[in-house]
Amino acid sequence: MKITIGHLYPDLLNLYGDRGNIQCLMKRCLWRGIEAETIAFELGDKIDFSKLDIVLLGGGSDREQMLVCEKLKEIQKDFKAYVEDNGVVIAICGGYQLLGKYYKTDQGMIEGLKLVDMSTEQGKGRLIGNIVMQSDLFDMPIVGFENHGGRTTIGNNKPLGKVLSGYGNDGQSGEEGVVYKNVIGTYLHGPLLPKNPQLADLLISRALEKKYRSEERRVGKECRSRWSPYH
């Protein structure tokens, strides 16, 4: 078994140590005898989403998001097809905002990928601090650190979790993140996956299930039932 992880634009979207999330995925695959490789894509690179099993879209400043905005338009069609075919995506902070239709800032409008029906607008002040949420995906809470000026509205989409302590998407709704098909978006840093290995295992399991179809669907279910998130 093999998983290929695509890290989109880590030279620009790596504000909060997203390489730690890549390292976590690689290590947890290694521990389970799953071959894994990471491909880091820069702005000038062509991305073949059909060869990727997990895509990481990390966080960046508003300036850096503006820099990648034009490139995102070029990959939008292929990225959308990947998502609709149940491709696995983890998007964090700025990357989370870019999943939606737009991010409206004081400096202008950043057009998003339109992969998920959601949008973000800059609010007054930043939402900063430790955060704890409860997700329907796991028995144990998800924890991390948030630091964002954007207020995200996810419409009719399902949130990643309900905030137990902290701010979440907008500081008011009590929701944090978004889940759409096999896409997970969140404001949580930490890095996210080392702090929440159960989430890393979910991404790996879903990637295996999709790649190997019926055979690995059975294996993935067995893996989820026996994997300890802290092993």
What spans do the regions from the language model cover?
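N-terminal beta1-alpha1 cap of cysteine-dependent amidohydrolase-like domains
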Residues: 1-84, 194-224
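Amide-donor transfer/coupling interface in amidating biosynthetic enzymes
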Residues: 2, 122-224
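Structural motif
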Residues: 54-58, 90, 185-187
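Cysteine-nucleophile active-site neighborhood
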Residues: 62-135, 139
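Short helix-coil boundary/hinge micro-motifs
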Residues: 220, 230-231
